[in-house]
């Protein structure tokens, strides 16, 4: 265990602290406490020598104000202790010393001893595993190295070559024990000098690390952070550690690093295996490994949320259809695919967030069907429940017709209105109107339109129309005007027509009778011997173109006892001399009663 280490290199600064530590990133950062250092880094000296104590703030910064203590009293300028600077104290008197930097907690106590013996064994105040330790056998006067002997627990230690320094490389628990040294007196035979006894107790530099996972129960595919937790000894808080992480004894990442954390972007159920970490000093003097730790990876449970615009899942042809899929409980990044039934539909998006949209600017009837989205995180696929999308065709302008085909009706007639849209998805609501007043409505689930029956009345004469609506908005038909006749108010019309026709018939009858009578009067009368004059009477010639009858007004009176004598009065007109007249006009005859 001998070597050629120089104590000035190994123990140039030995930081002695009494620290309260808190875990930070696996190592431990000292709380705000004061720190004391010794130079030279020993605790045993010969009387008359001087040791320098220096007080620092934690982190080895120079404090603004320092207080030194010995035996629970404040150290002032005394013959035994000389204050050189505010944070430095030179000591040549045995005792316990500590300091307080500014308002921090006091440092640990340092026990400094000044001996009057001829031979002393000098050792550092503390030994930690992995340290390179020097034990120096030191005499007041020069001694010959070949006369020195080191002992551990009463057993002599062999040094090659012989030296006044004993080296312990990579100190560990097997180096614990009681050490001392002896030397022969110069020019003396059989006389030995024996040093003081130093107890070496190798302290643990840091405990065995513990591996932690955050989160402790990760979800399949989610990121995980592994932390290798350990705690450096308070007096060795300036030691530098590095950390390594393993899965099934295979080194993770690019190797060991100063970070006590290792990030796994995604952990899967098949990787739920044995994990370990290792903490070691940068020079690999001390290395410790954690126990195996199995990370319980849970299967991901996808919770889908789908948002649809329009929210009713009922879309009219030509409208916008917007589908949005969001997933919780599944780690990303995710790739989203939209499916219609069993076939991939048009558009796929890859997003770092857990949202994806699928958009159809103008839907048509072929876009109807069941849709679902799929989220994939490169290892797992998660599928949402399918939801139906119904595409409706807006109704066209309806056509209003009459069953009779006539727009005129009599009061009391039964009328049937028929309203039908040639295009439109059911269910269609038809409504009938008279002069903007609703008459009734009907919902039709299939084609054929709707009918409305009503009995006409005088007040129902006017404009009729209908509307059709299947959810997008009502479409209005052209108006039909129906005229109504009231027979009780219009009898004068047929009566006047009847009278006119009757008068015409009577006029025609009178005219025909007149013609007949005139023709009858123009013929020769039947001979009557009793009434005709004798044949010897000269007869006046008769002419045509004379009035048929000239009424004579006789003056007579009837006496009851006398006989009535009928006379015939004949009037003749002179013959016209014009030769162009063809015949004689018939004689007019009028009969009258004459009194004798």
Curated annotation (Swiss-Prot):
Sorted alphabetically, the Gene Ontology BP terms of this entry are: B cell receptor signaling pathway; establishment of localization in cell; negative regulation of B cell receptor signaling pathway; negative regulation of release of sequestered calcium ion into cytosol; release of sequestered calcium ion into cytosol; single fertilization
**Keyword Protease carried by entry:** no
**Expression by tissue:** Preferentially expressed in marginal zone B cells.
- Family annotation (InterPro entries): Ig-like_dom (IPR007110), Ig-like_dom_sf (IPR036179), Ig-like_fold (IPR013783), Ig_Fc_receptor (IPR050488), Ig_sub (IPR003599), Ig_sub2 (IPR003598)
Mind listing the UniProt keywords for this protein, alphabetically? Cell membrane, Disulfide bond, Fertilization, Glycoprotein, Immunoglobulin domain, Membrane, Phosphoprotein, Receptor, Repeat, Signal, Transmembrane, Transmembrane helix
Record topological domains on the Cytoplasmic side: 518-596
Q: Which residues lie on this side of the membrane: Extracellular?
A: 27-496
Q: Which SUPFAM superfamilies does its entry note?
A: Immunoglobulin (SSF48726)
Membrane topology is:
Single-pass type I membrane protein
Q: What happens when the gene is disrupted?
A: Mating of knockout (KO) female and wild-type (WT) male results in 30% KO/WT pairs without fertilization output.
Does the record's keyword annotation contain Cell inner membrane?
no
- Positions with biased composition (Basic and acidic residues): 577-596
For this protein, the record's PROSITE patterns field holds: IG_LIKE (PS50835)
Signal sequence segment: 1-26
UniProt domain Ig-like C2-type: residue ranges: 34-115, 106-199, 207-294, 296-384, 398-483
Q: Where is this region: Disordered?
A: 522-544, 561-596
- Modification after translation, per record: Phosphorylated on cytoplasmic tyrosines; required for interaction with protein tyrosine phosphatases and protein tyrosine kinases.
Sequence intervals crossing the membrane: 497-517
Top-rank taxon? Eukaryota
Q: Where in the cell is it found?
A: Cell membrane
Q: Which sites does the entry annotate for glycosylation?
A: 324, 436
User: Looking at the UniProt record for this protein, which Gene Ontology cellular component terms does it annotate, in alphabetical order?
Assistant: plasma membrane; receptor complex
| Covalent S-S links between cysteines | 55-99, 137-181, 228-277, 325-373, 419-466
Its function?
Plays an important role in B-cell response to antigen that acts both as a negative or positive coreceptor. Inhibits B-cell receptor (BCR) signaling in the absence of CR2 stimulation but engagement with CR2 and the BCR lead to a superior calcium response compared to CR2 and BCR costimulation. May be involved in B-cell development and differentiation in peripheral lymphoid organs and may be useful markers of B-cell stages. May have an immunoregulatory role in marginal zone B-cells. May play a role in fertilization.
Question: What do we know about how this protein assembles, alone or with others?
Answer: Interacts with CR2. Interacts with CD19.
State the name under which the record lists this protein.
Fc receptor-like protein 5
The organism named in the record is: Mus musculus
Task: State the encoding gene.
Answer: Fcrl5
């Amino acid at each position: 265990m001998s070597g050629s280490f120089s104590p000035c290199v190994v123990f140039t600064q030995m930081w002695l602290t009494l620290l309260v530590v808190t875990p930070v990133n696996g190592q431990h950062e000292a709380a705000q406490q004061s720190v004391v250092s010794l130079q030279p880094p020993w605790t045993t000296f010969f009387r008359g020598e001087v040791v320098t104590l220096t007080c620092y703030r934690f982190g080895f910064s120079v404090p603004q104000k320092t207080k030194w203590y010995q035996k629970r009293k404040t150290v002032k300028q005394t013959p035994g202790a000389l204050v050189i600077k505010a944070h430095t104290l030179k000591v040549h008197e045995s005792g316990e010393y500590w300091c307080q930097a500014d308002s921090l907690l006091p440092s640990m106590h340092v026990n400094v001893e000044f001996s009057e013996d001829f031979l002393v064994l000098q050792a550092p105040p503390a030994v930690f595993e992995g340290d390179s330790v020097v034990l120096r056998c030191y005499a007041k006067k020069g001694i010959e190295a070949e006369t020195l002997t080191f002992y551990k627990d009463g057993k002599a230690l062999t040094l090659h070559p012989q030296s006044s320094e004993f080296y312990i490389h990579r100190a560990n628990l097997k180096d614990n024990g009681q050490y001392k040294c002896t030397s022969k007196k110069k020019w003396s035979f059989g006389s030995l000098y024996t040093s003081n006894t130093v107890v070496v107790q190798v302290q643990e530099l840091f405990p065995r690390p513990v591996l932690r996972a955050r989160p402790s129960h990760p979800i399949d595919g989610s990121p995980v952070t592994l932390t290798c937790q350990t705690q450096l000894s308070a007096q060795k808080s300036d030691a530098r550690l590095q950390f390594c992480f393993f899965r099934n004894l295979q080194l993770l990442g690019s190797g060991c690093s100063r970070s006590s954390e290792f990030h796994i972007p995604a952990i899967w159920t098949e990787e739920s295996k044995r994990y370990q970490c290792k903490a070691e000093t940068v020079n690999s003097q001390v290395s410790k490994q954690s126990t195996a730790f199995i990370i319980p990876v849970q299967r991901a449970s996808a919770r889908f949320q789908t948002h649809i615009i329009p929210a009713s899942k009922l879309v009219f042809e030509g409208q916008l259809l917007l589908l949005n899929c969001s997933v919780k409980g599944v780690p990303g990044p995710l790739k989203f695919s939209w499916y219609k039934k069993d076939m991939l539909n048009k558009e796929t998006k890859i997003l770092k967030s857990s949202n994806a949209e699928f958009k159809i600017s103008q839907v048509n009837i072929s876009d109807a069907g069941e849709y679902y989205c799929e989220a994939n995180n490169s290892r797992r696929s998660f599928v949402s429940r399918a939801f139906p999308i119904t595409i409706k065709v807006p109704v066209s302008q309806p056509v209003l017709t009459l069953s009779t085909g006539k727009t005129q009706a009599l009061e009391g007639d039964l009328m049937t209105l028929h309203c039908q849209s040639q295009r439109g998805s059911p269910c269609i609501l038809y409504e009938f109107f008279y002069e903007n007043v609703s008459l009734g409505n009907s919902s039709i689930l299939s084609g054929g339109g709707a009918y409305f029956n009503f009995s006409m009345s005088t007040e129902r004469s006017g404009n009729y129309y209908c509307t059709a609506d299947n959810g997008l908005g009502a479409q209005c038909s052209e108006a039909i005007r129906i005229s109504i006749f009231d027979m009780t108010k219009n009898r004068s019309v047929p009566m006047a027509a009847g009278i006119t026709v009757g008068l015409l018939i009577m006029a025609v009858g009178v005219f025909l009778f007149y013609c007949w009578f005139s023709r009858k009067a123009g013929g020769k009368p039947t001979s009557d011997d009793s009434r005709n004059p004798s044949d010897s009477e000269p007869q006046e010639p008769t002419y045509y173109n004379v009035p048929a009858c000239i009424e004579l007004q006789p003056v007579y009176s009837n006496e009851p006892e006398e006989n009535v004598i009928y006379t015939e009065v004949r009037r003749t007109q002179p013959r016209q001399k014009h030769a162009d007249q063809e015949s004689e006009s018939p004689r007019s005859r009028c009969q009258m009663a004459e009194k004798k």
